[in-house]
Regions:
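Conserved aromatic
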Residues: 407, 501-502
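Short glycine/serine/threonine/alanine-rich loop segments
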Residues: 45, 296, 483, 501, ...
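Generic N-terminal initiation segments characterized by hydrophobic and/or small/turn-forming residues
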Residues: 386, 414, 462-464, 506
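Helix-turn-helix DNA-binding segment
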Residues: 270, 449-493, 498, 509, ...
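N-terminal positioning helix adjacent to the helix-turn-helix/winged-helix DNA-binding module
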Residues: 384, 453, 460, 503-504
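Key residue(s) within conserved catalytic/signature motifs
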Residues: 60-63, 225, 504-505, 509-510, ...
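Histidine- and acidic-residue-rich, metal-dependent catalytic cores
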Residues: 2-449, 456
Length: 518
């Protein structure tokens, strides 16, 4: 790939993934970024404010995968509920609760409907506080790793607050919400309403919701200028438009900084499901090790490792009701699963630097005999690095717990790789190199474990943390470790305090960052 990547390109790509997570067309968040900048221009805000608004608009929902599990547990399809409530008036709690209940009870039998309604009515405030705290905490951890300053980080802590004090988790109100986030609150809602309904409806909503949901001065600006801004959006390419606005001097990601950014993307992806924690990191490491077994140049190893970090970008577009389903997928569900490498390709190809990773990243489910997806590429058309990642994806996937099965023993996963190779599905050199790198066969290196005492945690604390990060309840953790529920809860609170987090999602991210997934 190109040796450097503009930070704006990287963050704009993350914005595309956030669109997927909310069931919106790609570039929706880019469009809202443009609206936000134009509002800053008309209002005469200084360069510091405009630069902060730019990054906040593109990163607003970067914590969204962190609480996808919690949303899906209650609503089933977390993407659908997000899409349905995206344009609703967050300053009107009664309207939001009504629509949330309607979605949550649709299609359920009467007895189950009553239970869901009762849960929402009794627990809505507590659940929302915890849910939105998760999103903000994860966003802050990820953005800190991208070296953003306090202005961006402070604004993102108010992602779910509202002008009138009806937001979460702190019910902040008025100008206690940072100006950049007040701007983004308005322009992201207006982009969605204008796109889904009409510019006129968006302008009307800005006026109707002023002083309740939005800063009234900003809402008035939108009422006055929104029609012209929507016309500009209609004829502008959002990707090019957003990159043209990137704050100068452009920050270039290269070397370790580029690897760090791509690892942020990997963690953003894997946070989506408790079963995926650390998957992309693990694939990247094993792919790099296998590439060295094959004698790849270090440049080729680096490209393969980076492609492996972002190969699953497309999973953000599919709900956890599919990824975490405990039973067999229907044909229709599996058809949707087969789309995710294509979606990875679509997101990466907008940036020339990231598009160079597509040769391996978007081909991770292809097979040498043409039986894979999404392009059905055969061996004679496949890149050897891509073949390595294909074998890695299978091996790593098999050795991890899934919703419908326990993890394979490493030896059983190795046997399955050999079987697929013998049937022509995997490239022999790639498959054998992966097995050697994973610790199987002649010349194999012993598998390296994670740190023994990450963060100074005891063995028992690590066990508790792993299970909590996977989404197990306190009772389930107690049963798994043969301790009482009360003791398990004590351990969880102690561990969270020790590592400096307050939510399951943040704990899951900490686990990934400190290589204690397994």
């Amino acid at each position: 790939m190109r040796s450097s990547l503009r930070l704006g390109e990287f963050v704009a790509t993350l914005a595309l993934a956030q669109d997927n997570a909310f069931g919106q067309p790609l570039e929706s968040q880019l469009r809202s970024c443009l609206l936000a900048d134009w509002m800053c221009e008309v209002a005469g805000f200084d360069r510091t404010v405009r630069d902060t608004v730019y990054w906040v608009a593109l990163l607003r929902y970067v914590g969204c995968t962190g609480h996808a599990h919690e949303v899906a547990t209650l609503f089933g399809d977390e993407i659908a509920i997000r899409a349905q409530t995206l344009v609703h008036d967050a300053g009107n709690p009664a309207e939001v609760i009504r629509d949330v209940i309607a979605f949550a009870t649709a299609g359920r039998p009467p007895e189950e409907r009553d239970q869901v309604v009762q849960f929402i009515q009794q627990n809505a405030r507590e659940w929302a506080t915890h849910n939105f705290s998760s999103g903000c905490e994860v966003a802050d951890m990820l953005v800190q790793r991208l070296d953003f300053g306090p202005d961006v980080r402070d604004a993102l802590r108010f992602t779910f607050e509202r002008w009138g004090g009806t937001g979460y988790p702190a019910h902040a109100k008025g100008d206690t919400i940072p100006l950049p986030m007040r701007i983004v609150h308005l322009t992201q809602d207006m982009e969605a309403i204008g796109r889904l309904f009409s510019p006129e409806k968006a302008i009307g909503a800005a006026g109707d919701r002023r002083d309740r949901t939005y800063d009234p001065a900003l809402a008035d600006l939108f009422v006055e200028h929104g029609g012209r801004w929507f016309e500009r959006l209609r004829v502008m390419d959002p990707w090019n438009g957003v990159l043209a606005l990137e704050p100068e001097p452009h920050r270039l990601l290269e070397g370790d900084a580029l690897d760090g950014a791509l690892t942020v993307a990997a963690d953003f992806i894997d946070l989506k499901s408790p079963y995926m924690g650390g998957h992309s990191r693990q694939c990247a490491q094993l792919a790099a090790d296998a590439a060295r077994v094959l004698g790849f140049s270090e440049d080729a190893v680096t490209t393969l490792r980076r492609g492996a970090l972002v190969h699953d970008f497309g999973i953000t577009a599919l709900p956890n009701s599919i990824w975490d389903k405990p039973g067999t997928l229907t044909r229709a569900e599996y058809d949707r699963v087969e789309l995710h490498p294509m979606l990875t390709e679509q997101m990466l190809r907008r940036s020339p630097a990231l598009d160079a990773l597509n040769l391996v990243a978007s081909a991770h489910h292809e097979r040498c005999d043409g039986s894979g997806y999404h392009k059905r590429v055969r061996a004679d058309a496949a890149d050897l690095g891509a073949c390595v990642l294909q074998a890695v994806e299978i091996y790593v996937g098999l050795t991890r717990e899934r919703a419908d099965r326990p993890p394979f023993a490493a030896s059983d996963a190795a046997s399955e790789l050999r079987r697929l190779e013998s049937h022509g599905a995997l490239e022999p050199r790639a498959s054998r190199a992966v097995l050697v790198a994973a610790g199987h066969g002649e010349g194999a290196a012993p598998a390296s474990g994670g740190p023994k005492n990450p963060g100074g945690l005891s063995r028992r604390e690590v066990d508790v943390l792993r299970l909590a990060a996977k989404g197990l309840t306190t009772k389930q953790i107690g049963e798994r470790l043969f301790i009482s529920t009360k003791t398990a809860d004590h351990h969880i609170q102690h561990v969270y305090n020790k590592i400096g987090v307050s939510t399951r999602a943040a704990a899951a991210l900490w686990v990934m960052q400190h290589a204690v997934v397994h």
